[in-house]
Amino acid sequence: GAPMSFFCATGADPASQNYAREIERLRQKIAAGAELVMTQPVYDPAVLDRMLDDIAPLGVPVLVGLLPLSSYRNAEFLHNEVPGMQIPEAIRERMRKAGSGPQARKEGVRIAREMLAAVRDRVAGAYIMPPLERYEMALEVVDGFLDPR
C-alpha cells in the first residue's frame, strides 16, 4: 500500500498556573519537532490570545480546544475538580442561570461558539470535545463556521 504520513503534534494549556513554564516547555516541544499545537479547552479569548502572541514567532499552527459545557454542575466540576481547567466566573454564572437540561446545553454551545468566533482568525482550526454522548453539541458549535464545499 501507499506509505503513511505522520506529523507530530503537542498539547498546551494557555491557562496554566505556571504559564512561563508552560511556554518554555512548548518551545522545547516545538524545537524537538512538534509541528502543531492543540490547546486544552479554553473559555476566555484573552487567555488564548496571550499564548498565541507569545508563540507567534515559532510559526506553528494552533488548534483551539473547545469543550461545550452541558450544565452548571458540569462547569463547576470541570473548574473545581479537573486539574488545569479554568472556567471564568462569568461563564460559570451564565451556566448557573441556564441550569440544566436543554437550556443549559444551548448556553454551553453558545459559549463555545462565541469563543470560536473570537479566535477563528488567529488559529488554524478547532477541535470540539462534546460532553459524553452529546455529539450533536459538536455539530451545533461548528454550524455556520464551516466553509461550504
Residue ranges and their predicted role:
Residues G1-M4, G11-S16, P57-M115, L132, ...:
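Active-site pocket-lining/capping segments in soluble small-molecule metabolic enzymes
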Residues Q17-A32:
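Active-site glycine-rich loop that binds ribose-phosphate moieties when present
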Residues G101-P102, K106, D121-Y127:
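Glycine-rich phosphate/diphosphate-binding loops and the adjacent beta-loop-alpha structural elements
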